[in-house]
């Protein structure tokens, strides 16, 4: 750190040296250093001399040369717009130090004719590269586009967003690969300095050579805006380039077509522009250059692009493109010198059309997503209504975008979940029913790992003597469909809101006979007997048998359990409104949502746990019962209803929720303390 008293003197000295030191050109006519080493251990470096080959592995040499002789100096003037004056502040060297360094290097110059020849050849190669027509053409495109975006295209805009720069890079570097295949890697390295990519690994640059790139970007971010600018500068700067543009609607294609025409006519001579409105084509021909073309089409006229030759094909709002148009578009993948660039916003209205997100698992990294939510905090974002940014990232918002809590609430009132998808760019959370995950992964991990050892006396003596069992019967032998789910819960004496899952069953009937109720009741009784072995302090069991499927069968199950149970069993009863009779069954209704909400809260807060000695006669033989339950817990989703309420479900094509419902309802009855359980013979 500089001392305050020395700061003024240092500033004065720097000003004096800056004013007296003249800018000198980088002289490559004679070598500065020629090393006295064997030919196999040296290399000719065009900007310095003949140096030991080991220096090529050091970034210091490259950094030094680019600092004092950057490629971006002395650039040609742009054809339109204002040239960006890049700041270039190289360290100033005192004259005495400069003289001393020159003295040292002059003493170490070895007069080697062969080495001089090697150096001159390296210098000539460097000059040839810098005078190559392809390099000059591509450099002119970069300068033109940079200058055009520097307050020319839009007066108040001089900067572009990171995703817009990435779109430019995918376009530009693919141009290099098709314009100069033999010099692709060398030109890749040269243009790294133009885009500020000096530190990027060369292997990473190969991504830009992909045949297809996909960009998923939220609404109103300037997707089409930057495409118009890129295409306009491509036509005017690069000869013999053929560009295609496909939109999902005719008016969008016409709008882009008109905007490009207006841009070209405003900033470039009209005599170079040939417009063919009947087929949406623009031909731009500069003097002494081959013409470049643009064709704008829509997905409704898919045959218009068949038979065409495109080097770059931009597919705008690709998620909304008609599916029968995709074969005509994807056919250009076979063309060796063609690249497809899919650009789209998220289609939250229809998951079936959001096909671009399927490429997230592609072997090539071709999917680029602008998203304000990271995968690790997606759950937090869905659970907290007031959250408008990712908890771990500083939310970068473009100046022309507004994201706040009011916008979020209003947008979601129109379409639930639209804020997350349309505005925040989150694709992975889309579903047909706009479902949201409600249990965090951290809570599930804690539930799985932190299991109580209920065989220890100090734990057992803290448990109540009443066990709660819920039975969700299924009268089918189809193992691919629903089975009978049974859940058993014990609560703590000192805190009835805390409980332990001690048993669960998922029972499937072997065949459809008249003994279905007996088999289900026997399964429940086996669970009760096994519980008494581990927990002999249990004095009674409170049972709820769901009767939604068949009330008669549910009554039969309750009766059989009452007869076969080794201890007292109390049942919840349902009162018949017509006969005032009470049946030992439970009719599941609106309380299901309340039960799920209390269970979700218990999992997230850690007030429910599982026993290490979980009882299961049907699951444990092939699967860990708790892992079996966790698989269903992960599938819990909340469905919003039209009346503003919510319902919960965990059913999936490959996962049923029978065991989960039984455990959830058993927990609900064990902790709610508002239901009456009575003996079967009670009136």
Swiss-Prot record:
InterPro entries named among the record's database cross-references: DNA_pack_C, DNA_pack_C_sf, DNA_pack_N, HSV_TRM3, P-loop_NTPase
MF-aspect GO terms: DNA binding; hydrolase activity
Record flagged with keyword Hydrolase: yes
Motif (Walker B motif): 312-317
Subcellular localization: Host nucleus
EC number annotated for this UniProt entry: 3.1.-.-
Residue span of motif Walker A motif: 217-224
Assigned keywords, A-Z: DNA-binding, Host nucleus, Hydrolase, Viral genome packaging, Viral release from host cell
Catalytic residues (positions): 317 (for atpase activity), 472 (for nuclease activity), 546 (for nuclease activity), 658 (for nuclease activity)
Ranges in coiled-coil conformation: none
Disulfide cross-links: none
Record-level GO BP terms: chromosome organization
Domain of life of the native organism: Viruses
GO cellular component, one term: host cell nucleus
Keyword DNA-binding: yes
Known partners and oligomeric status: Interacts with the terminase subunits TRM1 and TRM2. Interacts with portal protein.
Similarity remark: Belongs to the herpesviridae TRM3 protein family.
Free-text function comment from the UniProt entry: Component of the molecular motor that translocates viral genomic DNA in empty capsid during DNA packaging. Forms a tripartite terminase complex together with TRM1 and TRM2 in the host cytoplasm. Once the complex reaches the host nucleus, it interacts with the capsid portal vertex. This portal forms a ring in which genomic DNA is translocated into the capsid. TRM3 carries an RNase H-like nuclease activity that plays an important role for the cleavage of concatemeric viral DNA into unit length genomes.
Designated name of the protein: Tripartite terminase subunit 3
Species for this entry: Saimiriine herpesvirus 2 (strain 11)
Gene expressing this chain: TRM3
């Amino acid at each position: 750190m500089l001392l305050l008293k020395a700061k003024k003197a240092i500033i004065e000295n720097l000003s004096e040296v800056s004013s007296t030191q003249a800018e000198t050109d980088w002289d490559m006519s004679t070598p500065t250093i020629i090393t006295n080493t064997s030919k196999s251990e040296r290399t000719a470096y065009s900007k310095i001399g003949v140096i030991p080959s080991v220096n090529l592995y050091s970034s210091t040499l490259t950094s030094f040369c680019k600092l004092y002789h950057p490629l971006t100096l002395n650039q040609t003037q742009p054809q339109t717009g204002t040239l960006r004056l890049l700041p270039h502040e190289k360290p100033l060297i005192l004259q005495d130090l400069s003289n001393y360094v020159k003295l040292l290097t002059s003493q170490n110059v070895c007069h080697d004719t062969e080495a001089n020849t090697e150096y001159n050849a390296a210098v000539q190669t460097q000059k040839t590269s810098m005078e190559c027509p392809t390099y000059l053409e591509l450099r002119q495109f970069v300068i033109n586009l940079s200058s055009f975006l520097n307050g020319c295209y839009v007066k108040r805009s001089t900067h572009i967003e990171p995703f817009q720069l990435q779109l430019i890079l995918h376009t530009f570097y693919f141009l290099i690969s098709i314009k100069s295949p033999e010099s692709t890697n060398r030109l890749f390295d040269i243009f790294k300095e133009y885009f500020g990519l000096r530190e990027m690994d060369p292997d990473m640059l190969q991504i830009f050579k992909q045949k297809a790139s996909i960009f998923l970007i939220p609404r109103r971010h300037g997707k089409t805006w930057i495409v118009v600018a890129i295409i306009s500068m491509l036509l005017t700067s690069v000869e013999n380039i053929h560009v295609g543009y496909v939109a999902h609607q005719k008016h969008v294609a016409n709008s882009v077509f008109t905007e490009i025409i207006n841009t070209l006519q405003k900033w470039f001579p009209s005599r170079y522009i040939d417009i063919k409105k009947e087929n949406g084509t623009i031909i731009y021909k500069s003097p002494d250059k081959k013409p470049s073309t643009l064709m704008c089409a829509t997905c409704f006229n898919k045959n218009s692009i068949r038979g065409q030759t495109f080097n770059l094909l931009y597919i705008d709002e690709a998620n909304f493109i008609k599916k029968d148009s995709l074969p005509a578009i994807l056919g250009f993948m076979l063309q060796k010198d063609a690249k497809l660039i899919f650009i789209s916003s998220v289609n939250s209205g229809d998951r079936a059309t959001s096909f671009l997100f399927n490429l997230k698992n592609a072997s090539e990294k071709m999917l680029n997503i602008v998203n304000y939510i990271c995968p690790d905090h997606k759950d937090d974002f869905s659970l907290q209504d007031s959250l408008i940014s990712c908890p771990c990232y500083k939310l970068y918002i473009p100046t022309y975008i507004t994201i706040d809590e009011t916008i979020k609430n209003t947008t979601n009132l129109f379409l639930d979940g639209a804020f997350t998808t349309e505005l925040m760019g989150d694709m992975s959370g889309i579903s047909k029913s706009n479902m949201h995950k409600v249990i965090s992964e951290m809570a599930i991990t804690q539930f799985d790992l932190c299991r109580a050892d209920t065989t220890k006396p100090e734990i057992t003596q803290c448990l109540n003597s009443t066990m709660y069992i819920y039975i969700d019967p299924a009268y089918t032998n189809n193992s691919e469909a629903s089975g009978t789910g049974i859940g058993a819960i014990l609560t703590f004496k000192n805190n009835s809101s805390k409980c332990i899952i001690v048993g669960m069953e998922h029972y499937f009937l072997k065949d459809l006979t008249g003994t279905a109720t007996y088999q289900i009741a026997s399964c429940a009784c086996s669970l009760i007997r096994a519980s008494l072995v581990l927990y002999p302090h249990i004095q009674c069991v409170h049972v709820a048998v769901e009767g939604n499927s068949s009330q008669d069968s549910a009554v039969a199950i309750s009766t059989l359990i009452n007869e076969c149970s080794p201890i007292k069993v109390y049942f919840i009863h349902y009162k018949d409104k017509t006969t005032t009779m009470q049946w030992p069954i439970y009719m599941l209704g609106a309380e299901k949502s309340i039960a799920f909400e209390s269970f979700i809260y218990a999992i997230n807060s850690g007030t429910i746990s599982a026993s290490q000695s979980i009882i299961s006669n049907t699951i444990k033989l092939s699967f860990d019962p708790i892992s079996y339950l966790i698989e269903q817990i992960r599938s819990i989703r909340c469905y919003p209803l039209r009346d503003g309420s919510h319902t919960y479900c965990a059913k999936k094509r490959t996962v049923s929720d029978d065991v989960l419902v039984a455990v959830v309802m058993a927990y609900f009855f064990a902790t709610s303390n508002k239901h009456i359980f009575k003996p079967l013979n009670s009136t």
